[in-house]
Structures are given as structure tokens and as C-alpha cells.
Amino acid sequence: MATLEQPYLDLLNKIMIEGHDKEDRTGTGTRSIFGAQMRFNLSEGFPILTTKRVPFGLIKSELLWFLRGDTNIRFLLEHNNHIWDEWAFKNWVESDEYHGPDMTNFGLRSQEDAKFKQVYQEEMKKFDERILADRDFAVKFGNLGDVYGAQWRHWQKREGGFIDQIQNVIDQIKKTPYSRRLIVSAWNPEDVPNSALPPCHVLFQFYVNDGRLSVQLYQRSGDMFLGVPFNIASYSLLVNLIAQETGLKPGEFIHTLGDAHIYRNHFDQVKELLTRKPYDSPKLWLNPDKKKIEDFEMSDIKLVDYKHHGTIKAPVAV
């Protein structure tokens, strides 16, 4: 059996030792390096972390959300997925329609002030409940703009209409697998100012060789402790799904990062993680009866023999 997370652990250690301390947009501060790469051989297993529990259900529902072309958190909340809550909540509390307690810089304040954290959690709970109960409210405040689902499946054309990049790349893999243009891009400069969070995953490129499908992701910004473990599992799952539709076997996931950073308030968690011995990586099971990515439901995707250490909690920087 293989332990596939070692490149991730090595990169964490390198950033802690060699990284540059910097200020950042969130006010939290980071330690980072610029330009890093990890490689994961998907034929040996599935590279989800074992040194801490990573909730695979959240990864499945988020990826299916992207592949639906959805940009509204309502679908995620229906699957008890709160990954994107903070960005939608930020839109709500900064709007003229919000008249509740002051939520300025709620991410940092909730870490430093226990009383405020309780107020923040109550406001977030009310927000989530209203998104689920009030469709008009969800349309207005649950939408995150042109994030991944929109860019992947509904890239707006200047002359009108849209491009479905995912379907295009699947068609190209089937017809011209040797192509060097098997690319999906999420970065549209025109949309960046209006997006809740400009795409961190700028583009990814597929590569076919000897019956195997690989992908390389370029990620402009990577939150190494919280975000990147999700990204590794999500794109590894994406490769497997598209490989099944195109009749190929999974090859490699190559993860290239621009600003690879650890937030200052994650240092203790990273140190704890690095003391843990990884287990063998699990295997991925996909329902063999599903032949198109649109057909997959949550129950069609499972991990087999996922043994892991306990959860390590850390705050999200917004």
C-alpha cells in the first residue's frame, strides 16, 4: 500500500522552515513561498490526508456543485456543506438590507472575542436558515457570482451565449487525446472585481498518455492547512470522474501553486500535524454504472479503507 500525502507534508515543513512572513488581505498574516509543486500518482490510491480527518462528503458535494454549474450556496447547505458560507454571509452583512449586529471583520474578530463569536454564529445560523427557507433571499444573497461553477460550465462569450468548458474538454479528450489544448480556465479579469472570492484555481490542463488521464492544476493562492487538502482530494476526484467518462484510467494529479502559504493562526495546528505518522492512503470507488459526470450522485462516490488521525480545527481567514 502507498502513503500518497508525503509531498504535502514535505511542502508544509518547507514553508515553516524556509517561508517568508508576510501581511495579507485578511489581516491575519502568513508564512509563504512562491512557486511549489506536488505530484500524486492516482494509480496507487486516493491522496486524501490521513494525518488528519478530511471530510470527504464536503469534497464530493462541492465538486458536484461545481460540475452542476451552480454558484449559489443553497445546494451546498442542502447537503450540510458550509465551506462557502462566509463569503455569501459577507455579501449579506455588507448590504444595505442587513440591520443586525456589526459584523465588520467577522472572521478575525470571532477568533479573538468569545462573546462576539457567539453573536456571529447566531447571525450565521439565521442566514443559513433563511437561505434554505426563502428562495428569493437565496437568489439575492446566496449567489457568489462568477465562481468555479459558472466559469467551468457557463463561461460568458462577448457576443452572447456561453462556453461549457468541462463538456468541451471531455469531447476533446475523446476525439483528440494528444491535444495540448485540454485546458479549463476560471480566471476572467472582467469578473474578478464582482466575484466573492476571485478564483484561486486559475486553470487546469489534462494530459493523456498510455491510456491514463492526468491533470495539472495551477493555483494562484493556496491556504496550505485548510484549503489545499480539499483541493488535492477534489481535483483527484475530478480526474477519476472524467477518466471514467472518457474510458481512461487515472494517471497523476500535479498540483502547482503560486503563493503557497500557512496562516499565522495555523502554525500550532501545522506543527501538530507534522508529528503524526501517515497511514496508507485509501482507494476510491465510483459506481461503474455511471458513465457521465452529470449522472453522479453523492452515493455513487465512496472511499474504501480510509483510516485517519483525528480532526485538527483551525479558523478560516475571510
UniProtKB/Swiss-Prot annotation:
Compartments, record wording: Cytoplasm
The UniProt record lists the keyword Repeat: no
EC number from the UniProt entry: 2.1.1.45
GO BP: dTMP biosynthetic process; dTTP biosynthetic process; methylation
Cited Gene3D superfamilies: Thymidylate synthase/dCMP hydroxymethylase domain
Subunit annotation: Homodimer.
Role: Catalyzes the reductive methylation of 2'-deoxyuridine-5'-monophosphate (dUMP) to 2'-deoxythymidine-5'-monophosphate (dTMP) while utilizing 5,10-methylenetetrahydrofolate (mTHF) as the methyl donor and reductant in the reaction, yielding dihydrofolate (DHF) as a by-product. This enzymatic reaction provides an intracellular de novo source of dTMP, an essential precursor for DNA biosynthesis.
Protein's recorded name: Thymidylate synthase
Organism of origin: Lactobacillus gasseri (strain ATCC 33323 / DSM 20243 / BCRC 14619 / CIP 102991 / JCM 1131 / KCTC 3163 / NCIMB 11718 / NCTC 13722 / AM63)
